[in-house]
């Protein structure tokens, strides 16, 4: 095989692996996150938010609100409107969230202590779920049942950084 063919094959394999990793969460995972309970094969587990840590100088001067999930730090990082979710020591910017909706919604900030935090496992996939109702206000009026959600796909050991998804849904 010549060098050009090897390069093309390597590139195709890389793209296929990246696409598989960044696959959107299933409907069961999204529903488990919104409803706060297991759905189908998506196993939902709450993250205790009654024990909160904070760090006013987290990685590059971010202010962090931290919880523990599976022995690891998870949470919310704030700095000059460049907020993000935390997994271990990695900050995943909200603005990089992949939309779950069409047309896509603009990722929204939220107050971490007012949100519901959980983990969801489906097969070999694991997610951190953050479900929030726009700081207790909903969208307004008849839209009080509208919630925002972030699902952060947790990479398997030794893999790339987490992938973040964002959506807005109505809770029934």
Regions found by a protein language model. Give the residues of each.
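Exposed acidic/polar residues on beta-strands and adjacent loops within beta-sheet cores, strongest
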Residues: 22-172
């Amino acid at each position: 095989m010549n060098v050009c063919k090897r390069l093309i094959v390597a590139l195709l394999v890389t793209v296929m692996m990246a696409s598989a990793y960044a696959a959107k969460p299933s409907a069961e995972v999204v529903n488990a996150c919104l409803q706060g309970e297991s759905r189908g094969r998506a196993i939902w587990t709450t993250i205790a938010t009654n024990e909160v840590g904070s760090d006013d100088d987290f990685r590059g001067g971010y202010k962090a609100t931290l919880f523990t999930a599976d022995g690891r730090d998870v949470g919310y990082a704030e700095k000059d409107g460049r907020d993000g979710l935390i997994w271990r020591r990695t900050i995943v910017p909200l603005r990089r969230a992949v939309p779950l909706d069409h047309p896509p919604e603009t990722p929204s900030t939220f107050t971490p202590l007012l949100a519901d935090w959980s983990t969801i496992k489906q097969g070999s996939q694991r997610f951190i779920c953050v479900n929030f109702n726009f700081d207790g206000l909903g969208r307004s009026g008849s839209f009080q049942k509208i919630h925002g959600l972030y699902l952060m796909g947790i990479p398997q050991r030794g893999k790339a950084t987490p992938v973040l998804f964002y959506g807005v849904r109505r809770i029934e």
